[in-house]
Swiss-Prot record:
It comes from Klebsiella pneumoniae (strain 342). The lineage of its organism: Bacteria, Pseudomonadati, Pseudomonadota, Gammaproteobacteria, Enterobacterales. Belongs to the KdpC family. The system is composed of three essential subunits: KdpA, KdpB and KdpC. This is Potassium-transporting ATPase KdpC subunit. GO terms for cellular component: plasma membrane.
């Protein structure tokens, strides 16, 4: 009987601490220090949400840069179905899917180098990746430039401007956010 009271008090204290104080503290600090990230890294244009800087979107038009293929079920880039394809490198289904993607990309990008960047034909671990390497974005430049009736130099310059490099080079590689790049293309068209 003498152990029940301290156990009950400890249970109530820990419940309040871990179920109330800690979540409120972390949420408050997140909103204060990392407001944009804590709210989904939303990208707005004229006050309207265009998407998240973290979640890929399915672009199919020739005048837009396309991101990595999505492994999400049924609907491409569906965040509710996030997950990789879980196909091993030795799986024939992966080989077939990659071959089909390579053929489709070569057909859609006849002026590009026949060596398709690997990230354009393989899914990311989350299936929702919105970033590409600059090389993969530059590979698509001839198609986008032709569809938008822009020079290759203009579109290449946009890719270079949209390239984000990590603060310290050993923390990652340079990336291009496809949503922001496509928004920059639309802004160029509106000028």
């Amino acid at each position: 009987m003498s152990l029940i009271r301290p156990a009950l008090v400890l249970f109530i204290l820990l419940t309040l601490l871990t179920g109330g104080v800690y979540p409120l503290l972390t949420t408050s600090l997140g909103q204060w220090w990392f407001n944009s990230q804590a709210n989904g890294s939303l990208i707005r244009l004229n006050g309207e949400v265009r998407g998240s800087g973290l979640i890929g979107q399915n672009y199919t038009a020739a005048g837009y840069f396309q991101g990595r293929p999505s492994a999400t079920a049924e609907t491409a880039d569906n965040p509710m179905a996030s997950g990789g394809s879980n196909l091993a490198a030795s799986n024939p289904a992966l080989d077939k899917a990659v071959s089909e993607r390579v053929q489709a990309l070569r057909a859609a990008n006849p002026d590009a180098d026949p060596r398709v960047p690997v990230e354009l034909v393989t899914t990311s671990a989350s299936g929702l990746d919105n970033n590409l390497t600059p090389a993969a974005a530059l590979w698509q430049v001839p198609r986008v430039a032709k569809a938008r009736q822009l020079s290759v130099e203009q579109v290449s310059q946009l890719v270079n401007q949209a390239t984000q490099t990590p603060l310290l080079s050993f923390l990652g590689q340079p990336v291009v956010n496809i949503l922001q790049l496509n928004m920059a293309l639309d802004a160029l068209k509106d000028k």
